[in-house]
């Protein structure tokens, strides 16, 4: 665990041994996360290393063996081969990912099974399979 910030008893930041490849950002306290299974989430390197916004996010049943929120965040341009390589995605504290892309915050308490796509620079919608994902890089 690479602790970027400690909030009370909760460590916030990277759950990964190598942080040098990740885009460095200032971590602020943006959310309070009190859900029982923890605050971990799986995030594509396209977001944390390449600078893309979250384009596709879904919440699956959390892994009860780990501090897992169930959230999975992708840029939206990852293919099966990219995702099959475990070196291309990492576990982060959910507050950290909110700092990479604040647009996800209103959706975080959605129920398990929820799936959203970015439909333009600032908006997400429930994914019903009829719209394309808006894939874009963050402005620095």
Model-predicted regions and their roles:
Residues 57-107:
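Acidic, aromatic-enriched beta-alpha/helix-loop junctions
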Residues 27-45:
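Short acidic, Pro/Gly- and aromatic-enriched capping/linker segments at domain boundaries
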Residues 54-60, 114-118:
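Broad, structure-driven detector of short, well-ordered beta-strand segments within folded domains
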Residues 48:
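Short, acidic, Ser/Thr-enriched surface-loop or helix-capping motifs
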Residues 91-137:
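Short, compact, well-ordered microdomains
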Residues 1-11:
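Short, Lys/Arg-enriched N-terminal segments with co-localized hydrophobic residues
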Residues 13-17:
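Short, aromatic- and cysteine-enriched interfacial helices/patches
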